[in-house]
């Protein structure tokens, strides 16, 4: 949305066609300066550009003959498009929405009206000649895209190619002013995978640094728990993450001093450890960020445990199913439900009451003689268990070092049995 800055100029982002009938639109920052009688467009907001960076295009308002909404025949696949007719050329521009387009058309038509001054015409002619000589000087200065890095405490500007090494765009003069792809151009589809919570709001803003207090354009992303900002939309790892639980207040920055004084659409995110100053592209965008961040913080304060509760449920459900698939289930297969319950109840007490390397025999007990066990097996069935009816084959076998448990009958043979041997007695 266009807005009026502190110098009473109409400003905002628009997409302009690089060459007429090419169908390729590039995002630029436009300034309608009625005092200088010209329409200027930059690679980005001049406050975010390097010192001395000029406009990449200019158009005198006196050359504009008509500004109108583009017909579907002219641009059938470009919504919210309007055209500026000037010097036998047509400049096609695309706005963000219908209201944005109407505001720009009305402002340009109002600014390009021809008015006859009441005073002499000679001073006005001199001013027009001076203003006409200014745009060629701006066009002579080459515009090169670059990235800014701090290496060893020194600011280093490195030229970069924006189209992947095919050479700099805009090196060939077209039908009108040379245009280059801007770093502020926002692609429609990002490469960063959304692995976390769904995003509530995302977009580019300008943020003040913490150490050098420099202003840099960053891609911000807001979800239910954090505010992250990235160097560009394609990055996967954020430069910093601000947790919403640490955010104390978010509001428009009204008390300004120093460098903040010249910043429009500025709001601040106050945390317990630091205050973040963020500049949006328009007042509507600023109020939208403030509203969404405040709503997310309030929702987190009202329902802080919903997420942790849902996670605990999801972790408990797989664990409960794993109990049935554990080692104990192998021992209990083929048993009736009652016997399975008994085995589950008795197994912990039996297994935990003895360790094979520390046998502690009770008083009055005698260990099984070594001759009664086979030399090839370390485990020996308890006396009477092998032939006793009702005992399952899957019962636990006693280790040779385990003390024998006391029995109700200390003597396991029946003395009245005729088949008993005298050697057994």
From Swiss-Prot:
Q: Which residues carry this modification: Phosphoserine?
A: 184, 314, 349
Q: Which domain of life is it from?
A: Eukaryota
- Answer yes or no on keyword Nucleotide-binding: no
Coding gene?
Answer: PLEKHA2
Q: What does this protein do?
A: Binds specifically to phosphatidylinositol 3,4-diphosphate (PtdIns3,4P2), but not to other phosphoinositides. May recruit other proteins to the plasma membrane.
Name the keywords, alphabetized.
Cell membrane, Cytoplasm, Isopeptide bond, Lipid-binding, Membrane, Nucleus, Phosphoprotein, Repeat, Ubl conjugation
- Binding partners and assembly: Binds MPDZ and PTPN13.
Instruction: State where it is primarily located.
Output: cytoplasm
Tissue specificity, please?
Answer: Highly expressed in heart, kidney, spleen and peripheral blood leukocytes. Detected at lower levels in brain, skeletal muscle, colon, thymus, liver, small intestine, placenta and lung.
**PROSITE patterns given in the database record:** PH_DOMAIN
Location of the Glycyl lysine isopeptide (Lys-Gly) (interchain with G-Cter in SUMO2) covalent cross-link?
141
Please identify the protein, giving its name as recorded: Pleckstrin homology domain-containing family A member 2
User: Entry's SUPFAM superfamilies?
Assistant: PH domain-like
Show the InterPro entries listed in the entry.
Answer: PH-like_dom_sf, PH_domain, PI-Interact_SigTrans_Reg
Gene Ontology cellular-component annotations: cytoplasm; membrane; nucleus; plasma membrane; protein-containing complex
Positions with biased composition (Low complexity)? 312-330
Q: What membrane topology does this protein have?
A: Peripheral membrane protein
Segments of skewed composition (Basic and acidic residues):
400-410
């Amino acid at each position: 949305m266009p807005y009026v800055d502190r110098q009473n100029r109409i400003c905002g982002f628009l997409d302009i066609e690089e060459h007429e009938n090419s169908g390729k639109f590039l995002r630029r920052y436009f300034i309608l300066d009625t005092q200088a009688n010209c329409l200027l467009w930059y690679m980005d907001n001049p406050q975010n550009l390097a010192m001395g960076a000029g406009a990449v295009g200019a158009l005198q308002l006196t050359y504009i003959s008509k500004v109108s909404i583009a017909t579907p025949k002219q641009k059938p696949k470009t919504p919210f498009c309007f055209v500026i007719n000037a010097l036998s050329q047509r400049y096609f521009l695309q706005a963000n929405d219908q209201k944005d387009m109407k505001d720009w058309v009305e402002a340009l038509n109002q600014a390009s009206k021809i008015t006859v001054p009441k005073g002499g015409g000679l001073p006005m002619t001199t001013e027009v000649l001076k203003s006409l000589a200014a745009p060629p000087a701006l066009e002579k200065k080459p515009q090169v895209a670059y990235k800014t890095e701090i290496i060893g405490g020194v600011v280093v500007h490195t030229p970069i190619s924006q189209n992947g090494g095919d050479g700099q765009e805009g090196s060939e003069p077209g039908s009108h002013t040379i245009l280059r792809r801007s770093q502020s151009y926002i692609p429609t589809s990002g490469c960063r995978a959304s692995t976390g919570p769904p995003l509530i709001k995302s977009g580019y803003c300008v943020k003040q640094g913490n150490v050098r207090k420099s202003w840099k354009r960053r891609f911000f992303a807001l979800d239910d728990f954090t505010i992250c900002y990235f160097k560009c939309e394609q990055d996967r790892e954020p430069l910093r993450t601000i947790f919403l639980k640490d955010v104390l207040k978010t509001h428009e920055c009204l008390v300004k001093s120093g460098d903040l004084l010249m910043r429009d659409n500025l709001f601040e995110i106050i945390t317990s450890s630091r205050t973040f100053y963020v500049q949006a592209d328009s007042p509507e965008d600023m109020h939208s960020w403030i509203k969404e961040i405040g709503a997310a913080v309030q929702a987190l304060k009202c329902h802080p445990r919903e997420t942790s509760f849902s996670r605990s449920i999801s972790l408990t459900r797989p664990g409960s199913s794993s109990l049935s698939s554990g080692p104990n289930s192998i021992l209990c297969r083929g048993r009736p439900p009652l016997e399975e319950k008994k085995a589950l109840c008795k197994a912990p007490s039996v297994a935990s009451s003895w360790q094979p390397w520390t046998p502690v025999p009770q008083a009055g007990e005698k260990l099984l003689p070594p001759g009664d066990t086979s030399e090839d097996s370390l485990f020996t069935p308890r006396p009477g268990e092998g032939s006793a009816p009702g005992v399952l084959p899957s019962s636990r076998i006693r280790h040779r070092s385990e003390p024998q448990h006391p029995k109700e009958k200390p003597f396991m043979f029946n003395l009245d049995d005729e088949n008993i041997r005298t050697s057994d007695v």
